[in-house]
Amino acid sequence: MLKNKGFYRGINLGGWLSQCDYSEDRLNNFITESDFAKIASWGLDHVRIPIDYNILENEDGSFKESGFARIDWALEMCHKYGLNTVLDLHKTAGYSFDSYGESESGFFDSAELQERFYRLWEEIARHYGQYSETIVFELLNEVTDKSYIDAWNRIANECIK
């Protein structure tokens, strides 16, 4: 974790924008302003927000403004309650390890899916790069298969450029 102010004690908001049923009711009501207030009252300094790519992208790879609006709202709440944010892309097109619906695979072998990943991160950076003091980014959750180390290091390096 960063050795900057505000990234020492946090909580994960899993099950809201990731690894969920994606219903509008859940997306709109699973996490509320009172949750952010409670987290701050516990003395925590940041929240980790896992997000699945399909919150931010349509099937064709175009962006969903409604997904970015959810993150915008979460960042407003974090600012209001003095919390920093870890924004975690929990899965991407072609990479998933959860049991919610799709069986995603092929990311590490597909230039097309990797380009889509880069475009998504460019859009995330465009939206949230100005929050550099209060937000950190996890490019992709739990890339643990050792056979993908070289591919992942290449992809991560390209994405960060």
What role is predicted for each listed range?
Residues 2-161:
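Active-site mouth of glycoside hydrolases
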